[in-house]
């Protein structure tokens, strides 16, 4: 399968798939709302140093991996939709407790408690997202539509990277961080309701289910792709640690829309390698103009370039992971992609806050070095992928 585009089938877009896709959007928005807002709250209101705030934000990325080895056992042992629902509900409860402690009790958080909170939040989101993307979304469609379902649902999560921070910054500007807490809880609750509205028939568990395993968690033979994706997202995480305004994230959304159009019309008959190469070149261009230019046009061009680059890179890497998967490993490929994407953003964000302390030139140079390294690495990774793909 060397086609650049995923075909669109109207029959895929039935009520249940819409509910799952929107649930993915809302759940991911709830997480991304905290990217630009929580570091401000930690440093300005909680009195954390930049190093402490960066460690706390980065702890989320480590939490993502903690429960992954148990995903296969949990969805076999319990009803798969309930595993996602309860993990998402626990996320909402954790944020609700944080809101109560911050707003109602007016308590200052200890550093170690905040690290634990972020780590736990990451572990719960990782579990919910693995079950949602690796099992529930593809269970709502026919087998021949699964690649399209993965592709389409992932775009909802991608748009959350602009919608979430945009919403969070607007709430913080006009109401305060307490509104961010409450909206985060609200988004998760609505996502839970949407998942609950979809009927998933009972599936008889396998006879010999191991409690710990890589099934639905991590694709070992996709490790080179995983590292390449993570390097790219580290650079993006570093970039997002800068104090951008709502305008930046609104323009990122424009970039995502342009990426969708480009996939539909520009990359239709292009070489398979072209999307990722183009995306990385465009992101490099965004970093360069942020480094070297101060004109008003930069505020529009740079975030559009970043959104466009992320859009085409994310879509292509997702399909690469699917093509690497063997029989019954589609769900595992989705989880591996999600972990590379999310952990890269989280660790880049944490490093940017902890180490650069507002020194944007050094941070942008580091991000540029990472993206150039990723581009060089991709020339080898793509050849490796072409030899090892299974679909």
Q: Can you say where each PLM-predicted feature lies in the sequence?
A:
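Intracellular juxtamembrane helix-capping segments at the cytosolic ends
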Residues: 127-141, 311-326
């Amino acid at each position: 399968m060397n086609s650049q585009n995923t075909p669109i089938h109207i029959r895929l877009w039935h009520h249940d798939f819409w509910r799952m896709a929107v649930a993915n959007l809302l759940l991911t928005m709830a997480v991304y709302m905290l990217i630009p807002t929580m570091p401000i709250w930690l440093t300005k209101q909680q009195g954390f140093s930049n190093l402490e705030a960066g460690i706390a934000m980065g702890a989320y990325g480590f939490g993502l991996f903690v429960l992954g080895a148990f995903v296969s056992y949990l969805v076999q042992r319990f009803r798969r939709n309930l595993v996602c629902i309860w993990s998402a509900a626990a996320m909402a409860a954790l944020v609700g407790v944080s809101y109560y402690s911050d707003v109602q009790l007016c308590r200052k958080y200890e550093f170690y408690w905040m690290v634990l909170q972020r780590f736990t939040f990451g572990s719960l989101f990782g579990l919910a997202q693995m079950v949602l993307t690796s099992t529930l979304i593809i269970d709502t469609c026919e087998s021949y539509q699964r690649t399209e379902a993965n592709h389409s649902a992932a775009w909802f999560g991608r748009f959350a990277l602009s919608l979430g921070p945009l919403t969070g910054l607007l709430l913080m500007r006009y109401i305060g961080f307490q509104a961010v807490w409450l909206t985060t809880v609200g988004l998760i609750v609505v996502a839970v309701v949407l998942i609950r509205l979809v009927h998933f028939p009972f599936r008889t568990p396998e006879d010999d289910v191991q409690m710990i395993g890589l099934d639905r968690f991590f694709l070992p033979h996709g490790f080179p792709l995983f590292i390449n994706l993570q390097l790219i997202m580290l650079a993006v995480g570093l970039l997002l640690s800068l104090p951008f305004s709502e305008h930046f994230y609104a323009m990122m959304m424009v970039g995502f829309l342009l990426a969708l159009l480009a996939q539909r019309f520009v990359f239709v008959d292009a070489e398979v390698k072209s999307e990722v190469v183009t995306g990385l070149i465009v992101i490099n261009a965004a970093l360069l103009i942020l480094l070297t230019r101060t004109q008003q046009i930069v505020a529009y061009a740079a975030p559009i370039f970043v959104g466009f680059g992320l859009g085409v890179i994310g879509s292509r890497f997702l399909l690469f992971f699917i093509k690497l998967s063997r029989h019954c490993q589609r769900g595992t490929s989705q989880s591996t992609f999600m972990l590379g994407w999310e952990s890269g953003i989280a660790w880049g964000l944490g490093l940017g806050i902890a180490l650069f302390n507002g020194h944007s030139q050094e941070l942008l140079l580091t991000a540029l070095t990472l993206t150039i390294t990723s581009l060089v690495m991709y020339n080898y990774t793509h050849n490796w992928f072409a030899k090892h793909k299974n679909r």
